[in-house]
Amino acid sequence: MDAHAKVLEALRWQADVTNDPLTAGVLDAAHADVFMGGATWHRLRPHAHLPTGAALALRLAGAAHRLALAGDAPAYAAHLPTCGGDGDVEAARAAFVALMADDRLDLRPVQTNEPGRLAALLPAFAAVHERTGLPLRLLELGSSGGLLLRRPEGIPVVGRRGCDPNPLDPSNPADRLLLLSFVWAGDLPRFRRLEAALDAAVADPAAVDACDAGTWLGAQLRGRTPGVTTVVFHSIVWQYLPPTTRQHVDLALAKAARRADDEAALAYVRFEPGDGVAETRVTHWPGGDERLLATSGFHGQDVVLAPR
């Protein structure tokens, strides 16, 4: 597949699966402009080599949204609900394509921290605690700003720590802007929820280390930690990890699993894509048994608990 066809496919797929009409609309307009060889094609052509998992269309939408949120794209912002705009999809399409000639567009790697996913993760944390009776030590891969490293109500947590190759600081205005820019510009409730989660993380911060997930997890799981259940978790992260990092994560878990016992248990919780939905799965050690705990939307909405 040549570069032009690859970019067209990336935009078409993202526009089709995005359930925010405004974001779907501007990506559809971008697709049409790329097809015609317009400014959007010239903007994206240098990035056409990126793999599918790099989410090129979301990088583009986030870059435009970031300019609007910063006050640097008023014509586009006028139509974005997240910027107080009117939500006019047709007007947003035209303004988006016009913005493609702006050299301030910065197609950063997608970095999200969706607090709504806690709705699907909390049942897993509760199930792990119910099974072991031990307080939890939470270790998150791909933590971003650490917004999911909260203290679940009613579940004792004795440690919270995460890692990310590029951790973001919820108290830093530039980092807040980056996270907010990857929310769909027409989804105001989700945008407000993220703002509230950023404020909560500032009030009760969790440590997030700048490190490769495989290297970091190997170090975190090196010793036995009696009296707690160590919970390794991640949410919509696996697709972004390089193959070598995935192998190192699997190896670290396998080594720790061999040491796990009833006094120092281990659980692996993941919220990742399934068949058209997100699946929350947990594997417990000792034992190594795996369960599907819940399905939901990819932002943690519409959680359905699996039968026990």
Q: What role is predicted for each listed range?
A:
Residues 1-100, 104:
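A short N-terminal interaction module
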Residues 46, 50-55, 67-97, 108, ...:
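Class I S-adenosyl-L-methionine-dependent methyltransferase module
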Residues 137-141, 233-234, 267-272:
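Extended hydrophobic secondary-structure segments that form protein cores and membrane-embedded regions
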Residues 211-224, 252-257:
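A short, acidic, amphipathic alpha-helical segment used as a generic capping/interface helix at domain edges
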Residues 281-308:
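SAM/dcSAM-binding transferase cores
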